[in-house]
Amino acid sequence: MDWRVLIVLTPLLIAGGWAVFNIGAAALRQAQQFLSKQS
């Protein structure tokens, strides 16, 4: 595997993982608020 591919993909994977982490955290917060309003 070419090392240049890794140099290009690594920041993209880090950014993608960070976005998923942030979106997941916000979704969990909203779900908890929704569930607490229901009860």
UniProtKB/Swiss-Prot annotation:
Segments forming a coiled coil: none
Transmembrane segments: 5-23
GO function terms (MF aspect): manganese ion binding
Keyword match Signal: no
Biological processes, Gene Ontology terms: photosynthesis
Recorded GO CC terms: photosystem II; plasma membrane-derived thylakoid membrane
Keyword annotations: Membrane, Photosynthesis, Photosystem II, Thylakoid, Transmembrane, Transmembrane helix
Membrane topology: Single-pass membrane protein
InterPro entries assigned to the protein according to its UniProt record, in alphabetical order: PSII_PsbY (IPR009388)
Principal subcellular localization: membrane
UniProt xrefs under Pfam families: PsbY
Subcellular location: Cellular thylakoid membrane
Family: Belongs to the PsbY family.
Function of the protein: Loosely associated component of the core of photosystem II (PSII), it is not always seen in crystals. PSII is a light-driven water plastoquinone oxidoreductase, using light energy to abstract electrons from H(2)O, generating a proton gradient subsequently used for ATP formation.
NCBIfam families found in the cross-reference section: PRK13240.1 (NF009711)
Complex and partners: PSII is composed of 1 copy each of membrane proteins PsbA, PsbB, PsbC, PsbD, PsbE, PsbF, PsbH, PsbI, PsbJ, PsbK, PsbL, PsbM, PsbT, PsbX, PsbY, PsbZ, Psb30/Ycf12, peripheral proteins PsbO, CyanoQ (PsbQ), PsbU, PsbV and a large number of cofactors. It forms dimeric complexes.
Protein name per its UniProtKB record: Photosystem II reaction center protein Y
